[in-house]
Amino acid sequence: MNWKEQLEEIGNCQDSNKAIQDYNKILTIQESPDDIKEEAILRLAKLFVKIGKGDQLPTLLRSVRPFFDKISKPKTDKIVRNFIDIFSTVPDNLTTLIEFVKENIQWCKDTNRIYLRQRLETKLFTLMFEAKDYANALSGLTTLLTEIKRLDDKPLLVEIQLVESRIQHALKNIPKARAALTSARTNANTIYCPPKLQAEIDMQSGILHSEEKDYKTAFSYFFESYETYDSLEDPFAMKALKYMLLCKIMTNQTDDVHALVNGKIGLKYHNNRSIEAITQISKSHAKRSLHMFQEVTKEFSDQLSDDPIIHSHLTELYSNLLEQNLCRIIEPFSRVEISHIAKLIDLPVDVVERKLSLMILDKKYNGILDQGTGTLIVFEEQKEDKLFNCSLETIGALSRVVDLLYEKTNKLS
């Protein structure tokens, strides 16, 4: 039996403990080929994750480091990066993963592995972004960016600038986020850009356009991103689809949401709770039902609150729905108690009072709050007097004529 057949036999073994022993045996046998050992390392890592022993991965990688001295640096780089990608699939281990990547960065510095260090640092700052450690991530990224620009490593430069754009967006610095993304897209156009990286760029472009309320352009970017992710069978395809549906809701095109979900694109996600959540939000928005909107956000809180992009736009959507409902309730009154409005809309009095104050300050509603009596006094909208405007225009025209006559008189004299 050759080495590849042995690997396949171990992979088909139902006894996990025996499989682990056999993989370790291959790693310790001097005669086993290097490529077989490389495959055994990654298979063993995946097995640990599969059986819920992901915490064993750091120990495993440390134990095989002597083997890395016997193979080329590019092969080592590939194994370590794949190993970290496997470790990334372990649930709820972000803090451990960050420390593990830091440990490997230090190992790269000690062994003078510059190429691998730069890529692991990029991975580290991406993980720090996910952990919401924005300040440290941005600080380290700026230093790395300067180093990579000197080397003119365009593929890595694109990845770094994309991460920078995400961090700046998280910090609500949209101009800098857009500048970083523009640089990433410009550099990506000068090289072969892997499909997944291009999909990430399109996704970030859509997010920034949606922040600027350009939902039509955002939708087109999300659609491009979805098609690429879908062709790669990447789970991020569902995320892109969610953002596509959100764009349709924000532009009041709720009929298109139904068409997308029940069409070719949405069929494979028919029973997905995240897509179901967005669909229900669309229905509540179409009905202008604040109560239904609240029920949906409560029922699907895990699917809607975990994503900051979705959460941000749903907050805006809720605010718009609340304004529309308040305007509809207040419309018949010239003076009404705030407590009565709160009772009709089924919200706490302080929430309603705060929202009415903002609407009045933003000049979305013409009235005042009498806090002494706890009432809203509504002013009638003053109709524009067309005769007054016409009179002003006539007087202005006469003034210009008189000025011209005065100038001519001065010339004659």
Swiss-Prot record:
Residues 217-383 form the PCI domain. One of its GO terms (biological process) is hyperosmotic response. It holds the Pfam family PCI. It comes from the Eukaryota. PROSITE patterns: PCI (PS50250). The keyword Metal-binding does not apply. SUPFAM superfamilies: TPR-like (SSF48452), Winged helix' DNA-binding domain (SSF46785). Component of the lid subcomplex of the 26S proteasome, a multiprotein complex involved in the ATP-dependent degradation of ubiquitinated proteins. In the complex, psmD11 is required for proteasome assembly. Belongs to the proteasome subunit S9 family. This is 26S proteasome non-ATPase regulatory subunit 11. The gene is psmD11.
